[in-house]
């Protein structure tokens, strides 16, 4: 099984309507199965959505997915027992939502207004099993490992990562993929962030930690192929999940 994944590294404006229109334009003119957009893309990082925006935007995106035979993964703030930093995986028939578990409250990041999520989100689509996480979550290996042990093939890691975090993000992504023999689809914001800027660098890491596709520090849409066959080959080479000592409690 193969899927064409579009890394949609585009700047989010403070106008949610414009962001949605741009998303729709990209989906209509790009040949891909899955379109991944950054953390909080619909509102922009630090922005907000008009009341009821998602009530119409999500069905609109579902209609687009039906028209194009694709899925869209996109970030947006959601009011649900507090404000959530959420990532949606939208298909013609289903809507899956993940709420960011680990909120960034340091440096230039201002996420004190959000309420942290409490659970993981995993689902199947077109013959592959997906999990989601958001930005700072990737620093916590338990998330990738939990998804992998539950049978995930791909972990989508949307982000709004600015300059100071780049050195850490570029180290951790390949490690998460390799130690769990899964694809990691990392999709970062681009453009200004206060006195700094989002650095882009969106990429796909293969199940052996190798980079399959990478964006530069500007706006772009890059399409790359992921496959279950490559995951199977990787797990024949590296037996990390098979050899994991699940009989040990791992508490000191």
Role assignments for model-derived ranges:
Residues 56-73, 139-220:
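CN hydrolase (nitrilase-like) catalytic-core segments centered on the catalytic cysteine
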Residues 13-16, 24-91, 96-97, 163-182:
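Cys-nucleophile CN-hydrolase/nitrilase-fold catalytic domain and related Cys-dependent amidase chemistry
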Residues 122, 189-252:
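C-terminal beta-strand edge segments of enzyme domains
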């Amino acid at each position: 099984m193969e899927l064409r994944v579009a890394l949609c590294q585009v700047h989010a404006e403070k106008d949610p309507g414009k962001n949605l229109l741009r998303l729709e334009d990209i989906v209509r003119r790009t040949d891909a199965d899955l379109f991944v957009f950054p953390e909080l893309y619909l509102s922009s990082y630090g922005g907000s959505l008009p009341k009821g925006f998602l009530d119409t935007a999500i069905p609109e995106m579902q209609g687009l997915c039906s028209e194009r035979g694709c899925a869209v993964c996109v970030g947006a703030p959601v009011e649900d027992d507090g404000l959530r930093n959420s990532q949606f995986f939208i298909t013609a028939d289903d809507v899956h939502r993940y709420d960011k578990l680990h909120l960034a409250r340091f440096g230039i990041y201002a996420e004190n207004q959000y309420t942290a999520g409490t659970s993981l989100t995993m689902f199947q689509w077109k013959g592959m099993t997906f999990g989601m996480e958001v930005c700072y979550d990737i620093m916590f290996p338990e998330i990738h490992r939990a998804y992998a042990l539950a049978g995930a093939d791909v972990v989508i890691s949307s982000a709004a990562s600015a300059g100071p975090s780049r050195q850490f993000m570029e180290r951790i992504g390949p490690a998460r993929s390799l130690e769990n023999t899964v694809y990691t689809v990392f999709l970062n914001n681009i453009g200004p962030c206060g006195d700094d800027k989002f650095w882009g660098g969106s990429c796909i890491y293969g199940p052996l930690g190798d980079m399959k596709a990478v964006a530069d520090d500007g706006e772009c849409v890059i399409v790359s192929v992921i496959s279950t066959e490559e995951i199977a080959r990787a797990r024949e080479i590296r037996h990390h999940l098979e050899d994991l000592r699940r009989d040990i409690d791992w508490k000191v």
